[in-house]
Amino acid sequence: MNNSIRQLRAELGWSQAHLADLLNVSRQTVNAIETGRYDPSLPLAFAIATLFARPIEAIFNPDQEPA
């Protein structure tokens, strides 16, 4: 799933480690989400959206439309 986490994180000057601490996940998890290798759970996606004060759909974009 495409997302804008890396860009949003950079705008705030946050490292992957800092974001990981705020979300209570590993830095590797943040990296995997940013690079699209891992899709976050719904609760984690909501936590990310809350931290960045944006709706989920403004951060996450599915690779393809559902059928």
PLM region spans:
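Short, charged recognition helix plus adjacent turn
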Residues: 50, 60-67
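Key DNA-contact positions within bacterial/archaeal DNA-binding proteins
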Residues: 17, 28, 57
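Short, basic-rich loop-to-helix N-cap that marks the start of a DNA-contacting helix
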Residues: 37-47, 65-66
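Recognition helix of helix-turn-helix/homeodomain-like DNA-binding domains
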Residues: 25-38
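DNA major-groove recognition helix of helix-turn-helix/homeodomain DNA-binding modules
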Residues: 43-58
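Short basic helix-loop element that most often maps to the first helix and adjoining turn
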Residues: 3-22
